């Protein structure tokens, strides 16, 4: 037995090194199948490394810069700019703004204030957390949003559940947000939430709360075009495929398309998760008068929320300043090119000023605007006191310590792969194969099949990687069968955000999984049904509201011009 244990130990120790060598060796035959095969080799090798996590994700993101030039697919001069392309700068701006929000604790104030309005009954508490989380996720990345909201949800669960887990401690007052404070490690261990010592119902509430935070952060990311990697990859692809064309996609038009189904995605998650862990009786209970026990629980939760909110004190200068800069940045994105009326970007030379420019102005302000009210002489009561220079809202030391550069590199790799898939002809080859299989089917059925493939794939790789592969394919498929360019590409951009099933599918899932309140099987069982609901909602939206909004019943002139320009350059299968 000891020997077998030793071999297992050895295997676990050396598996990363072994896989680093074996994965490219196994895939090496692809190198003999032209540019398409070489591109597939790079993508599959990266996917193997991503799934197994044999090296950090950020390091794996360097592979396109190494492999694509060496294999003669794309030159380094073309690959390198993808890592800090215009679209990636927009995402950089969003992350910097979210860092400023986190630094001044504005997100915490917004979350707790909204919770005071939605109530503390379990149904409405969960709904409230979903609404708050998805709202925040509209403006920042799903990973950052979940990282901000999961500790708040967990701390609230600790406040409500620990007294039930340890009846002898009921008389003790437990401060709500201890998770954020420095405290004695032994004391913290004593107060640690252990769901195995709770009733089935209370354990279910814990699972619901944490899963819904992860789901809401992913769902909220679908609502704006700048908030998540797949949406940005879609935006980058449509601008590359149809440069200087009025394709109808803007910050405002995307919100008009995406917000209505986002509400249905959230309701589906709220309904499925509670049905799974608490049962239909619990759901029906929202319409009856609460029992005395439930009233006591609600009172505990209400006190916890208000206590946390009161501890924040009055709104600080830093919070007000960050909120104003954040709102101005969002307004600049919404109004730059609203399509329905001329935007402010029309004041400048066409193509010179984009959303990244206005976002960088906001980021620049964060580094020069003071964290505290300026200490000007005219504001001081004591004129004899010397002036004090105030620190900015964020400084570079804060960025160096806390900025998630790995996400920027991961997204940059996604852009590089997406471009390589298009340039190498791999997108044409795969689209051709799919087209020969499903071309005789109605467009509606083709759209659903493509959505299912994307949603399944995104559970086993990062959402940016999935989007970077399938979005170029979706454009080629639309061109091949004569469908509107957005008809297949938009569901392909939305689908990677439906990675609800596995912890490794997205960092948001990993964050809530690490709280130990949920198991892998819990995620999978809920995720399967939620994926089905979300695919159905997307299909209905694409063939009703979005169909009208983007005028998909008519093949657009810009797509016709593009198809004409590409004649002779396309794959022979078309």
UniProtKB/Swiss-Prot annotation:
Signal peptide: none annotated. Keywords: Glycoprotein, Membrane, Transmembrane, Transmembrane helix, Transport. One of its GO terms (molecular function) is citrate transmembrane transporter activity. It is found in: Membrane. It holds the Pfam family Na_sulph_symp. PROSITE patterns: NA_SULFATE (PS01271). It is a multi-pass membrane protein. One of its GO terms (cellular component) is plasma membrane. Glycans are attached at residues 565, 569. GO terms for biological process: citrate transport; succinate transport; transmembrane transport. The keyword Metal-binding does not apply. The keyword Transmembrane applies. The chain crosses the membrane at residues 14-34, 54-74, 124-144, 205-225, 253-273, 323-343, 350-370, 403-423, 441-461, 485-505, 520-540. Belongs to the SLC13A/DASS transporter (TC 2.A.47) family. NADC subfamily. This is Uncharacterized transporter B0285.6. It comes from Caenorhabditis elegans.
